[in-house]
């Protein structure tokens, strides 16, 4: 999957004008959600059990593999990358060479990002790391928290997480459109503040289950969509044609490292302070993420939007 996912995601950025990449990333997230839904459905219908009670997952794995092969076949047969890149450069969405945030400078014979742009890239990556440290800690340990704290906690926890997922999926496309209007950085800050509010409410009110927690997790789902739809395109904005894949690798390195480290870190806090430390832990890291994203001066899109949603793709054959 490490060889499959980053190039597939980078391909979208390669063929999409920079100001439209938030919308493009929203579509990617939406399709990822559909893929997850497909797998959940197949887990229900494709897993069989023999007389001894042993589960057979062959059909499940075959169905998922078949979907991936089908997707690759469609990609190979329908996507003409060079043609699409040429069309994208022809459109260029009003971004001239002087405005290109991925423009490099030559130092000692090597191409490097200007220091202000490099600083912004590091700040954006720091934001991504802090976000995943906070958000993934809560989503990873929430089921354990609910099971230990509430009566019937597992069922309630599963529903809360499902509500968050549905809210995120429903928000992807609208958030992509809103981001084109108000800018990616502003949308990320809105998402971080919204997540912080949700975690703050849960800190004081989640010791007993109540249906209002579904609202809290719907808010958190919206926040997750706001951040993930826009942080990736901010990294891409600093890239240039030909090195989008490298910057995609930067994003995945930081995000996956944070997701790997945070269960260990939050586990230490929960062991020392108890389950009630879960939401404050997430709250602290989400609030910290507001600092670097507010300091980043590059990576935002130009908020001017086309008169028609399809205008940017209206090119002559």
Where are these regions (language model features)?
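Glycine-rich segments within core transmembrane alpha-helices of 12-TM secondary carriers
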Residues: 22-44, 252-262
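Short amphipathic helix-loop junctions that connect adjacent transmembrane helices
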Residues: 140-156
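Intracellular juxtamembrane helix-capping segments at the cytosolic ends
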Residues: 3-16, 226-240
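Juxtamembrane intracellular "pre-TM" segments in multi-pass secondary transporters
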Residues: 83-126, 309-317
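Helix-to-loop junctions at the C-terminal end of transmembrane segments
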Residues: 171-184, 270
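Loop-to-transmembrane helix entry/capping segments in MFS-fold secondary transporters
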Residues: 18-28, 154-155, 239-251
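C-terminal ends and interior cores of transmembrane alpha-helices
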Residues: 193-207
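A membrane-interface helix-boundary motif in multi-pass transporters
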Residues: 45-67, 268-286
């Amino acid at each position: 999957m490490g060889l499959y996912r980053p190039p597939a995601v980078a391909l979208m950025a390669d063929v999409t004008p920079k100001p439209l990449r938030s919308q493009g990333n929203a579509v990617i997230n939406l399709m990822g959600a559909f893929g997850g839904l497909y797998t959940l459905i197949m887990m229900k219908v494709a897993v069989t059990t023999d007389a001894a009670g042993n589960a057979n997952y062959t059909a499940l794995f075959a169905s998922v593999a078949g979907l991936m092969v089908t997707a690759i076949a469609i990609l190979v047969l329908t996507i003409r990358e060079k043609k699409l890149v040429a069309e994208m450069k022809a459109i260029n969405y009003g971004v001239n060479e002087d405005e290109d945030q991925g423009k490099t400078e030559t130092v000692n014979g090597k191409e490097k990002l200007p220091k202000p742009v490099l600083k912004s890239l590091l700040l954006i990556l720091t934001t991504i790391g802090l976000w995943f440290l906070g958000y993934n800690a809560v989503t990873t340990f929430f089921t354990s928290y609910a099971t230990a704290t509430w009566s019937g906690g597992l069922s309630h926890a599963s529903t809360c997480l499902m509500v968050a997922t549905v809210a995120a999926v429903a928000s992807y496309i609208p958030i992509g459109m809103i981001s084109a209007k108000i800018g990616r950085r502003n949308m990320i800050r809105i998402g971080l503040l919204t997540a912080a509010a949700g975690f703050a409410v849960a800190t004081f009110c989640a010791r007993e289950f109540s249906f209002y927690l579904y609202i809290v997790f719907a808010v958190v789902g919206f926040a997750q969509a706001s951040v993930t739809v826009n942080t990736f395109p901010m990294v891409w904005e600093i890239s240039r044609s030909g090195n989008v894949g490298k910057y995609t690798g930067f994003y995945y390195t930081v995000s996956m490292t944070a997701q790997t480290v945070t269960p260990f870190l939050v586990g230490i806090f929960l062991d020392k302070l108890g389950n009630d430390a879960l939401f404050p832990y997430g709250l602290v890291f989400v609030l910290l993420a507001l600092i670097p994203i507010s300091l980043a001066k590059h990576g935002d899109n130009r908020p001017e939007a086309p008169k028609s949603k399809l205008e940017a793709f209206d090119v002559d054959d």
